Amino acid sequence: MELFRNTNIDFLGKKWYFLAFSLVFSVAGLISMGARYAKTGTAVPLGVDFKGGTLVYVKFAQTPNLGDIRAAMDRSGLKDPKIQTYGGPANNEVLIALEQKETSEQALDAGKNTIIKALETNPASGKNDLNNVGSTTIRDYLMSKDPLHEVVDPGAKYQQIASQIVDYRDKERGGVLSSVDELQGHVPADVVNALKTDYFTSGFGVRNVEIVGPQVGKQLSNQALLATLYSLGGMLVYLWFRFELIYGIGAVVACFHDTIITVGAFSLLNRDISLTVVAAILTLIGYSMNDTIVVYDRIRENIKLLRRESLADIVNKSINQTLSRTILTSGLTFLTVLSLYVFGGEVLRGFSLALVIGILIGTYSSIAVAAPMLVAYQEWRGHRGTAALPGPAPRKNDRVKVKA
């Protein structure tokens, strides 16, 4: 399938427009990152994955309103919480990320209790929330009330009942009971009646609490940077052997260009960089490299066939010949990640945003950055006219070396 046939666009004739476009967006991103670094000490806004903090996973009985949750956090004095839904729309689950420097168990419990108090809009006076207590708390309460009048080993009996309550709540009801009466038929009626005296059920339950320490966040930051550099270095070596060194340099410069613009966009938009965003950046590096290799392959083939033409003409012709394939594959992928951005929920929003930006910039750079660099290199070396940049050929004596 071809979208365009016999196109004859002078891409290299527009190289100065391409250069201006790339410079504007690259410099804007770098200025934004520099200003942010001077102000906060980090070039980009980092998520809890990298700077450390507390992750609280909350399940709601009804569809949660993120605006109401954020307002409740603000009223409780919680500084700049990151709130997002996760799972499917019917899961009613929210992830709340808090900046928290301490990593002790006491700090974890304090963060959890603060969120519970913030979300309890109408707590029953003097009662405990059955959706947010563990089996030990329930056991101790039942032992103090002793509704079954146990004589022999009441601790073991009430521990068994408390475990049954927690298992039913978490495994069968998704962590949220709508009322204490839901326990009828699952535990003795006397136990239910005792619980109704001092317990109520809120419309939410804290499913899990995790702490990401600042040292772990720093380690993840270093690993993310190394992963990006290793991927670029590995691709450079591959293209060095697969093509000439200048091909590898051109492709890596294009990928670096894509990465700078994408990360700069996150800085300008004040969007957090998380581990999923790093995964998206590595993905777009591979995608951009693949797009560039398609163009390079065609340039290599045409260098062998059109030895009397200038390299600029060969590069132009090669870009035009691969234009249909480039736009078709990039367009379909772009529509996919755009749908993911619109419908994928807040958890995937950063990942999909990076891919949306990256695919657009990556497609552009394979045409307007990577390919023209071959011509710029030859002009810089002083080989003009019909002298063509060599392409890698597996056959002996099929390669013409560029002389210094």
UniProtKB/Swiss-Prot annotation:
Keywords: Cell inner membrane, Cell membrane, Membrane, Protein transport, Translocation, Transmembrane, Transmembrane helix, Transport
Gene Ontology biological-process entries: intracellular protein transmembrane transport; protein targeting; protein transport by the Sec complex
InterPro entries: SecD/SecF_arch_bac, SecD/SecF_bac, SecD/SecF_CS, SecD_SecF_C, SecD_SecF_C_bact, SecF_bac
Topology of this chain in the membrane: Multi-pass membrane protein
Pfam families cross-referenced by the UniProt entry: Sec_GG, SecD_SecF_C
GO CC terms in record: plasma membrane
GO molecular function: protein-transporting ATPase activity
Transmembrane annotation, as ranges: 15-35, 225-245, 246-266, 275-295, 327-347, 355-375
Superkingdom, natural source: Bacteria
Function: Part of the Sec protein translocase complex. Interacts with the SecYEG preprotein conducting channel. SecDF uses the proton motive force (PMF) to complete protein translocation after the ATP-dependent function of SecA.
Family label: Belongs to the SecD/SecF family. SecF subfamily.
Subunit structure and binding partners: Forms a complex with SecD. Part of the essential Sec protein translocation apparatus which comprises SecA, SecYEG and auxiliary proteins SecDF. Other proteins may also be involved.
Protein name: Protein translocase subunit SecF
Organism: Koribacter versatilis (strain Ellin345)
Lineage: Bacteria, Pseudomonadati, Acidobacteriota, Terriglobia, Terriglobales
